[in-house]
Protein backbone atom coordinates (compact mmCIF):
# COMPACT_ATOMS: atom_id res chain seq x y z
CA UNK A 1 0.00 0.00 0.00
CA UNK A 2 0.93 3.63 -0.58
CA UNK A 3 2.39 5.59 2.34
CA UNK A 4 -0.02 8.50 2.78
CA UNK A 5 0.22 11.74 4.71
CA UNK A 6 -1.30 11.76 8.21
CA UNK A 7 -5.10 12.00 7.96
CA UNK A 8 -5.17 10.47 4.48
CA UNK A 9 -6.34 6.94 3.57
CA UNK A 10 -4.68 4.50 1.20
CA UNK A 11 -6.65 2.42 -1.31
CA UNK A 12 -5.14 0.37 -4.14
CA UNK A 13 -1.93 2.39 -4.22
CA UNK A 14 -3.51 5.85 -4.04
CA UNK A 15 -4.13 8.29 -1.19
CA UNK A 16 -7.54 9.83 -0.52
CA UNK A 17 -8.96 12.40 1.86
CA UNK A 18 -12.50 13.70 2.22
CA UNK A 19 -12.92 17.44 2.72
CA UNK A 20 -16.41 18.58 3.74
CA UNK A 21 -16.20 22.03 2.16
CA UNK A 22 -18.71 23.82 -0.08
CA UNK A 23 -16.88 24.76 -3.29
CA UNK A 24 -17.58 24.98 -7.00
CA UNK A 25 -16.05 22.17 -9.07
CA UNK A 26 -13.32 24.52 -10.34
CA UNK A 27 -12.48 25.81 -6.84
CA UNK A 28 -12.52 22.26 -5.44
CA UNK A 29 -10.12 21.02 -8.13
CA UNK A 30 -7.81 24.00 -7.48
CA UNK A 31 -7.95 23.29 -3.74
CA UNK A 32 -7.01 19.63 -4.34
CA UNK A 33 -4.03 20.49 -6.53
CA UNK A 34 -2.76 22.87 -3.82
CA UNK A 35 -2.61 20.08 -1.22
CA UNK A 36 0.82 18.65 -0.25
CA UNK A 37 -0.03 15.50 -2.22
CA UNK A 38 -0.76 17.57 -5.38
CA UNK A 39 -4.07 15.70 -5.69
CA UNK A 40 -7.06 15.87 -7.98
CA UNK A 41 -10.77 16.03 -7.37
CA UNK A 42 -12.41 12.60 -7.37
Curated annotation (Swiss-Prot):
One of its GO terms (molecular function) is toxin activity. Its cofactor is Ca(2+). One of its GO terms (cellular component) is extracellular region. InterPro entries: C-type_lectin-like/link_sf, CTDL_fold. It comes from the Eukaryota. Disulfide bonds join 4-15. Expressed by the venom gland. Keywords: Calcium, Cell adhesion impairing toxin, Disulfide bond, Glycoprotein, Hemostasis impairing toxin, Platelet aggregation inhibiting toxin, Secreted, Toxin. It is found in: Secreted. Residues 1-42 form the C-type lectin domain. Belongs to the snaclec family. This is Snaclec lebecetin subunit alpha. It comes from Macrovipera lebetinus.
Amino acid sequence: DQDCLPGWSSHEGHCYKVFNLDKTWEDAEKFCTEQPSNGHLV
